[in-house]
């Protein structure tokens, strides 16, 4: 089935990126223009107060803009009738606060998010904030939450005492752990253990245990399916296999474009993740 094609613009998406991340942004924009109707703009930061504009396919590109002029540039480029979304793929945070005051939603996407996550409380007073890692965790979070649709699991929700996560990306593991700790009753008493994995997958597995109860999620070797396992003790474990869904960068950004409200679950998860090492 072909993806829907948009002939009109639905939002302005401003990506701040550089280096290898820049090509990934352009590749994602080629898809998003067709599937989400975005008005794409790419800005790289540098030393020019008024960089010239070039066009790559349907994307407006501004190379080497001085960070302190970023807010002026975005204000002049955005269309007032369209929501504006910022996509931050820079390690530097210079200009980030100013951008947050001009966009309706800010999507963080730094290789090392430590610094930008520390800014989330400040950013969230200006705009709705999310993160590409958070979007990538959506299927994991949904499946984990479904464990608690079982009355037997809900009855034991206060008994869990250990969370173990194996991950190729430690920051994703911290964010997922932060979400679980912030959402579970007495979550702060969980002993959190993280194990590094050398696979390219951001997450490989998680297990929440307490007494005889074990809740597990693991990525299967195919990399496109997750297995959920519920072991309540005294009975054979129950399992099922579910697709991970489209995990491409364009799909993750597309999902974020459909969200408009403030995401307090993300903010709470980031706050807890800061204390997990």
Residue ranges, per PLM feature:
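An N-terminal, globular interaction/scaffold subdomain
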Residues: 1-89
